Amino acid sequence: MAHATAPERVPLRHVAAQPVFARLRELRGSDELALQGVDTRSAVQLLDRLLAPPLDARTLAPSPPWGEGWGEGRPRQCAAADLSASDRDALLAALHRATWGDRITSSIRCPACEQMVDLSFELSALQRQLQPPPATVHVEGLRALRSAQGESFALPDAQAEEEAATLGLHAGLARLQASITGADSPDGAQLGTTLEALAPLLDVELDAACAECGASQLVRFDIQSFTLQRLLDERERVLGEVHALASGYGWSLDEIVSLPRSLRRALAARLTAAPPAFG
C-alpha cells in the first residue's frame, strides 16, 4: 500500500540552539537499488540522497542547503554524517512513516512454546515516550549538549562511530565515551544513562508477551537496521516493477528508477491488472 504524503517536517534536536528542521523527499528506485546494507554508512548515504532542500520563500525554488532555521532562519549546508545518531534515527523514523506508515508490526517466535508472537506499536508513540523534556538538555552547537546540571557532552558524528566500530566492542566504546565527555576514563554506566535521557536512540528493548503461554521476552528494536533491512527485503519487488514497466511501456532503466516510489508502484499495479490485448 502506498503511503506517499507531504514530506514530514522532522525536528533535528542536536544541531543548533534554535529549532532546525529537515524534510526527506520520497524514495525512488535509484535510492532503493543503491542501498547496500544496514550499517551506519549505508544509512548516511541513503539519508544524504533523500534530504530535500527547503524552498526559498521569495522564489519558491529549492535552495541548496536543507537545514531550515539554522543561523537565525538562514539555511546552511549539513550532511547526514554530521548529525547525531539520535537525529539520524528521527529521519529514519520519518522515512518509515512516509514509506509504510507509523505502525511497526513484526512476529517473533516464543522460546517457551514455539508459537509466533505478534509485536505491534506506533513509532510516533515510542518517540514521544523517549523524548526528554525541553528543560533537560541545552543545545550549544552541532552535537554539543549541556545538561541541566551543567555537564557538557560532544555527541559523535557518523565517522567517529564507524572508526570506533573498527576497534572492537570494548575499545570502541571506550573511545566514544572519552570523546563524548572529554575525560580519559568516564563512568560508562552513568554516561549511558545520561545520554539515554539527553539524546535517546530508537534502539530499545521491548517486552513481548506470548498470548498462548504468557511467557515474556525482551525484543530489540533498532530503527536503522529495521528500516534499511525492510528496504533490502523489497529489492526483488523493485526489480520486478522495473521489468514490468520496461516491458509494458518501453521505458529505460534510468527513466523508471527516477520515478517516485508511489508512482512506480501504482503504474506497475495498473499494468499487472490490465486485461490482455486481442490479436
Label every model-predicted segment.
Residues 1-60, 75-279:
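Long C-terminal interaction/binding lobes of large macromolecular proteins
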